[in-house]
A protein has these predicted regions:
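Adenosine-phosphate binding glycine-rich loop
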Residues: 146, 318-411
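A short, basic/flexible loop-to-alpha-helix module at the beginning of a structural domain
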Residues: 224-240
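Glycine-rich phosphate/diphosphate-binding loop of Rossmann-like nucleotide-binding domains
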Residues: 235-302
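Short, well-ordered secondary-structure micro-motifs within conserved domains or adaptor modules
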Residues: 291-325, 335-337
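Cytosolic/stromal cytosol-facing helical appendages immediately following the last transmembrane segment
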Residues: 1-124
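Metallocofactor- and cofactor-centric catalytic cores in central/energy metabolism, strongly enriched
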Residues: 116-219, 224, 228, 282, ...
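Short, charged/polar "capping" segments at the starts of alpha-helices
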Residues: 197-203, 272-278, 307-309, 327-330
Length: 411
């Protein structure tokens, strides 16, 4: 399996092995090759034959003399610097195999846990320890679309670490370092994916603006486009919806937009109802209703929704998540929509992997938002309490060829 892993990594077309790894353990240079090392075999042909262990090329004199120089040059990335960076993170321990340099058979399909992957627990444990000490985000994928070069970078931390308050400062340091690196490289936009834009973690990205007031790279949390994606999933003619789960920036702007459109927003928890009511303009209070019923046919589901709440839903109810992560599938007689996402245009290049649980050629609305922000050359940030505008973001995405994704399934 090690040989297979190294083979996949060697053909991923970009350099991801950090230099400090060889500085800490110099003999590793002879035991493990890098993508840039193997790329010379395809360009120079009679050098760097090794598929995973350069030791034999050194022994038999087939090592390319420019290997170290090529490695350094690839790390610096002088040839192609990204215009847009999407910053995501690892989810569970098996998710590292779902990246492009993991197993292509897994990365090309929507992520689902595989029971047989547990036989690789020694390698999984080693990868967890490596990511724990790894001090920077790494590049997992590069793409092209129109005039833009995009990169997906991964913060080497898992969900359980994001949920730990003791890890908060370290994670913020990693994210801020990635933002400043993107700024140094001339990136126009950096979009924050998954938990990298948490309210408790960094105030939806606002923390980094406070620390770096002269930041030129625009921070995008993607709220506007994600809200638009959720609203597009609500069936036409819907007069009322039930809002459940934790309150958030997404919950507020969803409620605000729905109330402005004359749709009744129902809530069942009084404390959350009172808090949201304080945030909404007084003229919209009549559209926000405290209900003692779960009878609404459309539920907008946030983080924190319980199994007991789902069990109170009537048969055939639509659960539409407005969160980064899909809800637990509790009901087999109800319809579960996908998290906010869009289908990418056919001209989007080099998209060979699935983004987490999304199908091939489908991208989360938060990631699309960063790309659209750069294409439109919008000057403002979308983080903290600021939004680009729901209609503005939606129409811009459609104009650039992104299409609504209406993925749904029975529980």
């Amino acid at each position: 399996m090690y040989v297979d892993f190294m083979n996949y990594m060697g053909h991923c077309n970009f350099e991801l092995v950090p230099k400090w790894l060889f500085d800490v353990f110099p003999p590793l240079k002879y035991l493990m090759y890098t993508p840039s090392f193997h790329s010379l075999h395809h360009t120079q042909f009679r050098t760097n034959y090794s598929l995973f262990m350069p030791f034999y090329d050194y022994v038999y004199g087939t090592i390319d003399k420019s290997s170290d120089e090529q490695y350094e040059r690839s790390l610096k990335g002088k040839e192609e610097r990204p215009h847009v960076v999407h910053l995501t993170h690892l989810t569970n321990l098996q998710s590292i195999y779902h990246l492009r340099f993991g197993f292509s058979s897994l990365a090309s399909k929507p992520y689902t846990p595989k029971y047989y992957m547990w036989i690789m627990w020694p390698l999984t444990l080693a990868s967890m320890l490596l990511t724990w000490i790894y001090g920077t985000a790494f590049t997992a994928e590069r793409n092209r679309f129109k005039k833009l070069i995009m990169e997906t970078r991964v913060v080497p931390r898992y969900i359980f670490q994001y949920k730990s308050s003791s890890e908060r400062d370290a994670i913020n340091t990693l994210i801020e370092k990635a933002i400043l690196q993107s700024e140094e490289e001339g990136a126009k936009v950096i979009s924050l994916g998954l938990l990298n834009q948490g309210s408790a973690l960094n105030g939806y990205g606002e923390l980094y603006l406070k620390r770096n007031s002269l930041l030129k790279t625009k921070i995008v949390d993607g709220t506007s486009l994600a809200v638009a994606g959720v609203l597009n999933s609500v069936p036409k003619g819907t007069n009322s919806i039930l809002l459940v789960g934790n309150l958030s920036k997404m919950a507020y702007f969803l409620s605000l937009t729905l109330c402005k459109r004359g749709v009744q927003v129902e809530m069942v928890q009084k404390d959350k109802y009172e808090l949201l009511k304080l945030q909404l303009p007084p003229e919209l209070h009549g559209h926000l209703v405290l209900s003692d019923s779960y009878a609404s046919e459309v539920w907008l589901v946030g983080d924190g929704v319980t199994d007991q709440e789902q069990l109170r839903a009537s048969k055939g109810i639509r659960f539409i998540p407005f969160t980064q992560f899909p809800p637990k599938l509790v009901r087999k007689d109800c319809i579960y929509h996908c998290t906010p996402a869009m289908v990418v245009p056919r001209t989007y290049e080099n998209l060979h992997t699935c983004e987490n649980w999304l199908p091939r050629s489908v991208m989360s609305a938060w990631r699309v938002a960063g790309i659209v922000h750069a294409l439109e050359e919008w000057n403002g940030h979308e983080c903290g309490d600021t939004v680009t505008g729901v209609e503005k973001a939606w129409h811009a995405a459609l104009a650039h060829g992104f299409l609504p994704f209406q993925g749904c399934k029975l529980g």
